Amino acid sequence: MFTRAATLAAFTIACALSQTPAANHDLGFEDTPMLPGLPYHVHDDRRPHPALVTPSDVPGGPPSDAIVLFNGKDLSAWTAHHSDITRGGGSGTAPEWKLENGYAESVPHTGDIATKEKFGDCQLHVEWAAPPEIQGASQSRGNSGIIFQGRYEVQVLDSYNNPTYADGQAAAIYGQWPPLVNAARKPGEWQTYDIVFEAPKFEGGKLVKPAFLTVFWNGILIHNRKESMGPTQYRQVAHYSEQPAEDSLVLQNHNSKVRFRNIWIRRLTGYDQPEK
């Protein structure tokens, strides 16, 4: 038989329970199945949240986490580079390229330029233009290159009504893979490359993961995570050899007056990075 005191205690407990907030499932769960190969449940409330990145206010502009390599003012992020020094890196001397009207233009016979910083996996945005005056043909017309880690080249070339070998035209992974389509603009018009580069991985001197490239040319996908056969070679088959995990980005000087502007890069990391 309930006493008055027992009844009052039960009422008090019931009121307290009714005021306990329910689990907020909008923020996640811990009673759902585990994701295969991961230490997290489906919709896990303990999973790290992605870092916040602020997009640019203008199309093609650098987001808040980008490293601006060229802003139209100077080449302070670059050094002169000659291929007889190393595949990556530079000479330590200032580039001799021309700066004008917000762009950098390669000056024939002054060598390539290489970034002072070194990079592994990355996202690159670069805008370029072949010379407006048509000179030469095939590989002699507006030739340059974007060379990741000083080894893996995406070709720059005036490919507007300019026949050449397919794996050497603009946006080719040079000597290996032609682009899926030719998205070339006319000579002198600005063009864009947006490239995701995945660096190769080595363990004990052996290749365990090749390099991959995803390339958008003027907004059009022309390489979809395409595997590189190895460092770029001319008239040879590429082969991998052990290399540093990070190395410089190189802009090639092929003795054509190619222009570049608005160059920025983002270091890429994996999923589930610790929150800062």
Where are these regions (language model features)?
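Positively charged n-region of N-terminal signal peptides that target proteins for export
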Residues: 1-5
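Hydrophobic alpha-helical segments
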Residues: 6-7, 69
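Bacterial N-terminal signal peptides
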Residues: 7-16
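Carbohydrate-interacting regions of secretory-pathway proteins
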Residues: 19-276
